[in-house]
Amino acid sequence: MSLMREIPWESCLLEPRRDPKLERRFRRATGRPIGPVIYYSGTSWLDDTTLWFNVNVAKQVSIDADLVGLIAMIVSQDNSCRFCFAETRALLRILGMPERRISQLEHDLLSEEFDERERAALEFSRRFSRANPPPDKRDFDALRTAGYDELQIIEIASVASILVFFNRVTTIFALPPYSMEKLPDRWYVRLFRPLLAFAVSRAGNTAQIEPLEPDEREGIFSEIVLGLDGLPFARSLRRTLDGMWASTVLARREKALVMAVVSRALGCPLAGKEVGELLLAEGLRGEQIDEILTHLTSPVLTAKEQQIVAFARETVWYEPARIQQLGRNAMQGLSREEFVELVAVASIANMICRLGILAGAA
């Protein structure tokens, strides 16, 4: 496999926007600089989601940080996400993993001599990310045979789903990976590595089980969220979905179309049924919905909706340079805020539909 830094990557689609308040929140919560958020900050629910999901990746209930790092590497590698891979690589270096070991992992993660338990988790995570075909009962049984309990399996899937989200956000926006790729070799990082490692590890303490409150058990895609109940990620996902749906940057019908296109492409009946009901509530008839999802076009779509539908389909599986070029084209007909929300909604859709498939397979 070629090195991640050799993957073609377009120039960044967005100009950075500094937000000192958000930067302070992020640093306090994660122990790290804000990183990519400065490029797409300004959409309230997405700012919050980025912070919550970063904390959820760092703090696990039942699996250890080393496994989380390996899952992050394999999912980012599977999605050809140079930014997330470089970020994970840098964190592993800061936390003390030797460069030689990381380079071996980068060349071929699954050729490494992992024990049966680690390999089962990584195989599952890669199949979850790729979703072509998605994991099925046999994959769950393989995890159980390897010694994982139900909470650990859900947590492995949750970590992989968060990476699916971040991989798309950072790749589609073409966030520049170059400084992150060089970060571990900077003199000041080498000098202060013990302090940086302490700050990062302190922010990644073990999380506690957090059952959802009664009012968090309702809302769009509640059945999928309830399948994660007990993990702090379930609360983050509930709040994310509520914030996304309440946002007025894109119309609800536009967001529902994105969700519907992704659920059809991935074959997620759970999400597909619910999003079909959302589209009916937004004024589309059943035969119109079927026409849109079958042909990705329809006379009932506005020009903007047509653009959104076509773009959403491309986010399911992609090559980085091509999806970045398509993103640049999509920007021409949308405001910055609309484009940022479109990418965020499509990324959430890819996450939620993969989780929805698991709910049916487990």
What are these regions, as identified by a protein language model?
Residues P33-Y39, D66-N79, L110, E150-A157, ...:
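Alpha-helical scaffold segments that form or flank carboxylate-/histidine-based iron centers
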Residues W45-T50, S80-C84, S129-R138, P232-R238, ...:
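Short acidic alpha-helix initiation/capping motifs at coil-to-helix transition points
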Residues I71-L95, V159-L163, K255-E282, I289-D290, ...:
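Short, thiol/selenol-centered motifs that function as redox-active sites or metal-ligating centers
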Residues E106-D115, T294-L301:
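Acidic/His metal-coordination segments adjacent to aromatic residues that form catalytic metal sites
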Residues E118-A157, T302-V343:
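Acidic/histidine-rich alpha-helical segments that form the ligand environment
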Residues I153-T170, F339-G356:
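Amphipathic, Lys/Arg-enriched alpha-helical patches that create a basic surface
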